[in-house]
From Swiss-Prot:
Residues 1-17 form a propeptide. Cleaved by the prepilin peptidase. Methylated by prepilin peptidase at the amino group of the N-terminal methionine once the leader sequence is cleaved. Disruption phenotype: Deletion mutants can no longer assemble into the pillar-like structure. InterPro entries: Bac_GSPG_pilin (IPR000983), N_methyl_site (IPR012902), Pilin-like (IPR045584), T2SS_protein-GspG_C (IPR013545), Type2_sec_GspG (IPR010054). This is Type II secretion system core protein G. The chain crosses the membrane at residues 18-38.
Amino acid sequence: MIKRSITRSPSRAGQAGMSLLEIIIVIVLIGAVLTLVGSRVLGGADRGKANLAKSQIQTLAGKIENFQLDTGKLPSKLDDLVTQPGGSSGWLGPYAKPVELNDPWGHTIEYRVPGDGQAFDLISLGKDGRPGGSSYDSDIKYQ
C-alpha cells in the first residue's frame, strides 16, 4: 500500500482581509458612482417633465379652442373648462379635468386673456414655479 502524505499550505496569518483604509476607499468609489448615476437619472426626469409640460400646454390650448367654438367666447379663467361658468350658453364641458390645469411639477398653468400677440397665453413657469429662469426652470409658453 502506498501512503501519501498530505501537506498543508502555509499559514495565512498575515492575510486577515481588507484593511479599514481599503474599505473606506471602496465605499467612497461606490458613493461617487451612485452620485453620477443619480444625477443622470434625475436629469432625465426633468427633461421628461419639460417635454410633458409642452405637450400638456398644446392639449390645453385645444380644449380652450373647443370651449370657444361651443360658447362663442374664450374662457375668462381655466376653471371655466372644468365647471360651467354662469351665463355661458352652449357649454358642453367639462373640457378638462382639474389635474390638467397644473403642470408636471404641480404648479398652476398661467392663463392670460388677451395674450401677448395672440388671443390667449398659456404658461408653465417650469420646475421652480417662478417667471424666467434657465434650463428646466425656464418658462414654457403656448406658441
